[in-house]
Amino acid sequence: MMRILLFVATNLAVVLVASITLSLFGFNGFMAANGVDLNLSSLLVFCAVFGFAGSLVSLFISKWMAKMSTGTQIISQPRTRHEQWLLQTVEELSREAGIKMPEVGIFPAYEANAFATGWNRNDALVAVSQGLLERFSPDEVRAVLAHEIGHVANGDMVTLALVQGVVNTFVMFFARIIGNFVDKVIFKNEEGQGIAYYVATIVAELILGILASMIVMWFSRRREYRADEAGAQLAGTSAMIGALQRLRVEQGLPVHMPDTMKAFGINGGLKHGLAGLLMSHPPLEDRIEALRRRG
């Protein structure tokens, strides 16, 4: 609950600071002088409500969406010794991390992957792929589970929802300012909002959305390093490195994880350079090297 309260407080603070900053720099006067009659404070609040609403809804239904999109089967009563071991391992790691036991599931995929999601660190879901269970050693699976428990314990789902809400707000806000500026100043439209407003707003949202995604993915990559550190603390550095090395060997296999879930999986990060700016995970070799430096 404290994380949700922090979420709301941070959102309000962002809107307040942005509104004050725009006023101090005379942005309202600049827009009015150029024929754009906008109440920027009201527009900012409007964009914040819709921007954060989307990320909040996604956060609260994340477990349901994950189960539906991946076909995850929750283990309520273990039927095999592998399922029994999986439940016991997650319970042990959760206790060490100081969180409540999450739901545990298996999703039908050949690639080795796992994910954690949920709106609350004490109401989460941790799932692993069938391929990971079949091909990884118990120590490697335990390290992967420790990484996912690290995500839950660090509150990464709430953090990324917060970041996404902030960037959603400013993408909507500045796209509409650009749309109004193009419509009123460049095309001199004085009768409501013309076609130029809608075209410019859509184009601006696309461009700003790409830039915003880079910010969100940067935060996501930082959280992966932290989850690796948590995994190393819970399962041992050598086991965590071994699991990442094994994932690197399997990177050529096709990935069937839905795009909406890739940011919460353990496997990813194949691209470097500009393409790497839009990746949710750092390259595996970088993650392995970071753990080696950590010792």
From Swiss-Prot:
Can you cite an annotated GO cellular component?
plasma membrane
The UniProt entry's GO biological process terms, in alphabetical order, are:
proteolysis
Cofactor annotation comment: Binds 1 zinc ion per subunit.
- Which superkingdom? Bacteria
Q: What's a Pfam family in this record?
A: Peptidase_M48
Q: Where are the transmembrane segments?
A: 4-24, 41-61, 158-178, 199-219
| Annotated keywords | Cell inner membrane, Cell membrane, Hydrolase, Membrane, Metal-binding, Metalloprotease, Protease, Transmembrane, Transmembrane helix, Zinc
Which residues does the annotation say bind Zn(2+)?
A: H147, H151, E224
Q: Where in the cell is it found?
A: Cell inner membrane
Membrane topology classification: Multi-pass membrane protein
Swiss-Prot/TrEMBL cofactor(s): Zn(2+)
The parts of the chain that form a coiled coil are none
Question: Where do the catalytic residues lie?
Answer: E148
Give the EC number. Answer: 3.4.24.-
One MF term in GO for this entry? Answer: metalloendopeptidase activity
**What HAMAP family does this protein's entry cite?**
Pept_M48_protease_HtpX (MF_00188)
Q: Give the UniProt family note.
A: Belongs to the peptidase M48B family.
> What name has this protein been given in UniProt?
Protease HtpX
Q: Which organism is it from?
A: Pseudomonas putida (strain GB-1)
